[in-house]
């Protein structure tokens, strides 16, 4: 059964001849354009294909072509960025190019549904990294040499498996398994099935690969071209544990449904009522920047709500339509008791207990020493309603909220707090569904 499912998955994961011809035609066209512009620049050494296209591990549903422009290592950072962008814009000018940002800017365009990236990097020896993209050409050479044809197909299957189940992508929004990580896992373990077997029995902090260093992350994956680099450091604990659970389920009861899109639109009303959604608009910026900011904002607000007595079960974030974002919080309850117990020091600690009594005596409804000799006080909460508290926190105490400075101007222009059961944007609705529903693929009892 399992072998039959893996065989069927190839029809989804492996491109057909029509798709191959389409991407090859565009790749050759664009490479010629980029190479022509690069030859005009004395700082450029050479131009190469990179990424999944060059390694033959690309999948049909997302067609990308990466073209790397190698610069002399003596090129200044300013010229590296300026000339890199010029080559990208001049070569792709017919296709409405635009700038995207990683550590350094690169130029991207869409050509008949195929994403084309023109990425600058330095011509250096292995280990002499000057920019984040410098390793990429070494990755391409290594994987092109080491991966067999069947292993490349298994990389494609693994990518599709992770994409469909929400664990694929290195961007901050996802914090999942990157395309290169998929290649590395298949390189180390030999096949898609072996990767799942390894993940199903994974121990905390287990290392895949070899390194002289020790790393602290739930999953350690050593970059085969840089033994001091842990590729697993960027993968969230949620994605690691979800992969473990799904791998166990697939090996126990395989199904092609693991490779097919699932509906995420159902929203349990009971839990939706206990969900708060903070909506706001922001000035346009890169996805990595906005997601880094809204994730920090959600984490800080969650901590503030817990301090105030509201039990936050889960939180999430989503950015959409280029200038809109939402922070989502699932609470145990939106309202809590007006009474709050605050614990103090032991009576035997003379100075501390005296100070506690002085500070709390006026606002206390009741004060006593419990059976362990600790002081306790019953007080009236400032807030009984989570939405009321959250509104006041953002509106009147923004500087103390923990929301990053880079977002505060956006919040000052306005925000709105909705309940999870209210009518929502499609992207927000999908995020609410993910937040408050059990993923049956991950948590199957079969």
Describe the function of each predicted region.
Residues 1-60, 74-78, 107-108, 121-124, ...:
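N-terminal regions immediately upstream of nucleotidyltransferase
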Residues 35-48, 92-96, 303-311:
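Short secondary-structure junctions
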Residues 51-59, 94-99, 104-108, 171-173:
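Catalytic micro-motifs at enzyme active sites that drive phosphoryl/nucleotidyl and oxygen chemistry
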Residues 58-63, 67-72, 117-149:
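Hydrophobic, small-residue-rich alpha-helical packing segments that form membrane-like cores
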Residues 81-87, 341-346:
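Short amphipathic alpha-helices in soluble, non-transmembrane regions
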Residues 82-129, 313-326:
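Conserved catalytic core of two-metal-ion nucleotidyltransferases
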Residues 150, 155-324, 329-342:
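Conserved nucleotidyltransferase catalytic core and NTase-mimicking acidic/glycine-rich helix/loop elements
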Residues 323-446:
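Extended, charged low-complexity segments
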């Amino acid at each position: 059964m399992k072998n039959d499912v893996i065989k069927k998955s190839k029809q989804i994961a492996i491109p057909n001849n029509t798709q191959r011809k389409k991407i090859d035609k565009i790749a050759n066209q664009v490479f010629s354009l980029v190479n022509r512009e690069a030859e005009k620049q004395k700082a450029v050494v050479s131009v190469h294909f990179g990424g999944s296209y060059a390694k033959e591990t690309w999948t049909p549903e997302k067609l990308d072509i990466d073209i790397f422009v190698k610069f002399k290592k003596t090129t200044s950072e300013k010229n590296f960025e300026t000339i890199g962008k010029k080559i990208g814009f001049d070569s792709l000018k017919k296709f409405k190019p635009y700038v995207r940002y990683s550590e350094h800017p690169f130029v991207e365009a869409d050509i008949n549904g195929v994403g084309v990236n023109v990425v600058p990097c330095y011509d250096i020896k292995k280990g002499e990294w000057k920019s984040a993209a410098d390793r990429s050409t070494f990755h391409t050479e290594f994987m092109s040499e080491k991966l067999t044809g069947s292993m490349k197909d298994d990389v494609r299957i693994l990518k599709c498996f992770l994409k469909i189940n929400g664990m694929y992508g290195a961007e901050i929004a996802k914090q999942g398994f990157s395309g290169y990580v998929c290649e590395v896992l298949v390189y180390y373990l030999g096949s898609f099935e072996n990767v799942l077997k390894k993940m199903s029995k994974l121990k905390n902090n287990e290392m895949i690969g070899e390194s002289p260093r020790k790393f602290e992350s739930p999953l350690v994956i050593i970059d085969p071209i840089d033994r001091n680099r842990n590729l697993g450091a960027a993968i969230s604990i949620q994605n690691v544990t979800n992969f473990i659970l799904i791998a166990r389920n697939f090996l126990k009861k395989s199904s092609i449904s693991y490779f097919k899109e699932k509906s995420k639109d159902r929203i349990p009303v009971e839990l939706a009522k206990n969900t708060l959604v903070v909506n706001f608009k922001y000035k346009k910026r890169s996805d990595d920047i906005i997601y880094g900011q809204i994730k920090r904002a959600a984490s800080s607000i969650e901590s503030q709500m817990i301090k105030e007595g509201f039990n936050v079960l889960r939180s999430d974030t989503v950015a959409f339509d280029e200038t809109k974002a939402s922070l989502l919080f699932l609470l145990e309850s939106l309202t809590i008791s007006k009474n709050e117990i605050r614990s103090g020091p032991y009576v035997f600690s003379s100075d501390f207990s005296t100070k506690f009594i002085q500070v709390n005596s006026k606002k206390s409804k009741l004060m006593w020493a419990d059976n362990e000799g600790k002081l306790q006080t019953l007080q009236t909460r400032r807030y009984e309603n989570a939405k009321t508290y959250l509104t006041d926190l953002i509106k009147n105490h923004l500087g103390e909220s923990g929301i990053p400075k880079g977002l505060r101007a956006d919040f000052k222009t306005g925000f709105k707090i909705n309940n999870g059961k209210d009518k929502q944007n499609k992207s927000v609705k999908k995020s609410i569904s993910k937040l408050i529903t059990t993923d049956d693929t991950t948590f199957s009892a079969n």
